[in-house]
Amino acid sequence: MIDREQVRKVALLARLELTPEEEEQFTTQLGSILDYVEQLNELDVSNVPPTARAIDVSNITREDNLQPYADREAILSSAPEQEGEFFKVPKILNAE
């Protein structure tokens, strides 16, 4: 079980200021979470193979195919700025 002092220490590390009511609330909530984790630790998983995902999924992406659009000008005209045939967007990298 977790106590209020441990909750205060975690709050300090996370740079959070908790009221006494919040300390009590988080003590109860974190205690419940840790109790549940303890129950999970008691499960026998020796016959369960290690997995990275719950279901086996591979390459769910689609092919990236270029498809012409009939009304290109309508799309470009909706942009706040454009440069030739392209959307112009603000520079975000090395903008210093």
From Swiss-Prot:
It catalyses: L-glutamyl-tRNA(Gln) + L-glutamine + ATP + H2O = L-glutaminyl-tRNA(Gln) + L-glutamate + ADP + phosphate + H(+); L-aspartyl-tRNA(Asn) + L-glutamine + ATP + H2O = L-asparaginyl-tRNA(Asn) + L-glutamate + ADP + phosphate + 2 H(+). Its EC number is 6.3.5.-. GO terms for molecular function: asparaginyl-tRNA synthase (glutamine-hydrolyzing) activity; ATP binding; glutaminyl-tRNA synthase (glutamine-hydrolyzing) activity. It is an enzyme of class 6 (ligase). The keyword Ligase applies. GO terms for biological process: glutaminyl-tRNAGln biosynthesis via transamidation; regulation of translational fidelity; translation. Transmembrane segments: none annotated. Keywords: ATP-binding, Ligase, Nucleotide-binding, Protein biosynthesis. Disulfide bonds: none annotated. Heterotrimer of A, B and C subunits. Allows the formation of correctly charged Asn-tRNA(Asn) or Gln-tRNA(Gln) through the transamidation of misacylated Asp-tRNA(Asn) or Glu-tRNA(Gln) in organisms which lack either or both of asparaginyl-tRNA or glutaminyl-tRNA synthetases. The reaction takes place in the presence of glutamine and ATP through an activated phospho-Asp-tRNA(Asn) or phospho-Glu-tRNA(Gln). Belongs to the GatC family. HAMAP family: GatC (MF_00122). This is Glutamyl-tRNA(Gln) amidotransferase subunit C. It comes from Nostoc sp. (strain PCC 7120 / SAG 25.82 / UTEX 2576).
